[in-house]
Amino acid sequence: MLTLSSFFFPKNSSNKCWHENKITGLSFNSKKIAQNEIFIAVKGQNTDGIAYTKEAINNGAAAIICDKRSIIPNDVLQFLETKNIPLFKVKNPEITAAKTAKIFYPKQPEFIFAITGTNGKTTILDLTEQLLNLMGYKETATLGTMGFQTRNTKFNKLKNKINGIIGINPLTTQDTITLHKILDMSYYSGVKYLITEASSDGIMRHRIDEIDFVSCGLSNISEDHLITHGTMKHYSNTKFSLFSRLPPNKTVVYNNDDKYAKKLSDYLHKKLPEKSFNIIKYGKNSSANEIQIHQIKSNKYGYDIEIKIFDKNYKTRLNLTGEFQIYNAMHALGFVLSIIPKNKIQLAVDMLKKLKTVDGRMELIKTKNGADVFIDYAHNPSALEKALIELRKITKGRIISVTGISSGKSESRNETAKIAGKYADVVIFTYISPRFETADAIIAKQQKIFPGGLHGGKTRYAAIKKAIKMAKKGDSILINGQGHERFIVEYGKPKPFYDPDAVKDIISKE
C-alpha cells in the first residue's frame, strides 16, 4: 500500500508525523471520497473545491491538495490542524492530480492512441478498433463519448465495470483520476490497444497528462465550444496542445485538407521541434501526404477509392456513407500504420472494405416504402452541414431533416436550424435533451432562425414519426443530434430513448 511519502511531497517538512499515512486512493469528490484517500480541491467556474475540505475530511480524507491561490478560511485551517491532516498547496491541482494518479495507477496498455477534433472523434476511434481487429490485433478497446467499448468478449466484465464507474452519460474525456484508473484496470485485464477521445476541455484541464501515447491525431477544427474557449485561436491551440503530451519519436496523424492543418504543422515545427515526431498526413489536396487520396468513385452506399501510401498505390472500397467517412477511415488507417510493419500495409488496405458503419454515425435504416433513414450524431452546425451535403449527392428525392438542439446550448449550436433550412427540403424541429425546457420553447428558438421549419410535436418520437410518414420512395431522412446516445435528459433525469429503436418501432407499425 502506498503512503504519502510514496508521492513527490517533500520529506523534510516540519510536520513529519503524516509521512507514513496509508493512502488508498485519490478523489475530486468530497462526498464520494473513501477512507484514507487524498482529496484534490480544484477551482471551478463558480466554486473552489477548498470549500468542501471539512466534508472531505469527515468522510475520510487523509490529505488535501489545493490551488496555492486559494483563500483558505481560518476555520478550515484550524480544522486541518485539529485533525492533523496535511495540506499541500500547488500551482495547478489538475496537473498534480495527473502526476499523482500516474503514481497510484502506474500501468497502461502498451499502445494508446488519442484523437481530438471538432467532428469525427468517435467514428475514428471505432474504425481504428475495427481495423485492428480485422488485421488480427484483438486485445482492443475504446474510450470516449460512447463510454468504454470493446469487440473482444473476454473484456466484457471489464467493460461493465468501467461503464458502471463512468455512468450512462460519460464525459468525452474522463477526469484524470478516473482515466488513469481505467488505464490501470485495462492493463491488468489484458487490453493492449486502447483508442481514446481527447476533448478540448479534457486537454485544457490536464485530464490526459501523464499518458504514454503511441500516436495522437487531429481530425478537423470548426467553430464549437466557444463558451468555454472564447476564441477560435484559444480553441485550436488547446487542440494542438494534445501533441505536447506525445512522447518524442512517436506519431502524429492529421487531416492535411483541414483549414487548420497549416497551423498545426507550424505548431509542431516551431513549438515542439525537439520531439522529432513521425508525421502521417492524409488528404486529397497535397502530394506531400503520406496517405494520398487519389480517386473517389461513389455510389449510394459506398466508395471505390485509390490511395497512395508512402509512394505505393493501392485500390480498395469503403462501404460507408458520406465522403467525410473516407477521411475518418484514412485517419484510422494512419493510426494503424503508426504501429504495424510495412509488410502489413497491404493487409490494412484490404481490410478497409470490411469496415462497418459506427452506431449513430450515418447509420442507415430502410423504410418499407423505399425511403432511407440516416441517424447521425451531428450535434453541431459543421457536422450537420457535412451530413446534409453528402445526402444531397446520393438522394434522388427530398431530404427531410429532423433536427434540434439541446437546452442551454450556445447560439452557435442554434445555427443548426439555419443549416437545416439551407440544405434540406423539409425541416422538422425537435429537441435533443430538453433538460428543464419544454419542446415548445426549444422549437420556438429554432423557428425564429428558420421560420419554415415544421413543429415536430411534444416528443422526439413524434418528430421522427412525422418524418417517416411523409417520406416517399427516393427520399432521405436525416435524424441528427442523438446518434448513439440511449438517453434523453428531461428535468434533470435520464429517460431511455434511442433513435434507431424509435425508427424501427415506427416502421414496424406502418
Residue ranges of each PLM-predicted region?
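Adenine nucleotide phosphate-binding catalytic loops in nucleotide-utilizing enzymes
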Residues: 229-236, 240, 250, 254, ...
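ATP-dependent carboxylate-amine ligase
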Residues: 1-14, 22, 35-38, 44, ...
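Alpha-helical segments flanking ligand/cofactor-binding loops in enzyme cores
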Residues: 31, 54-55, 184, 233, ...
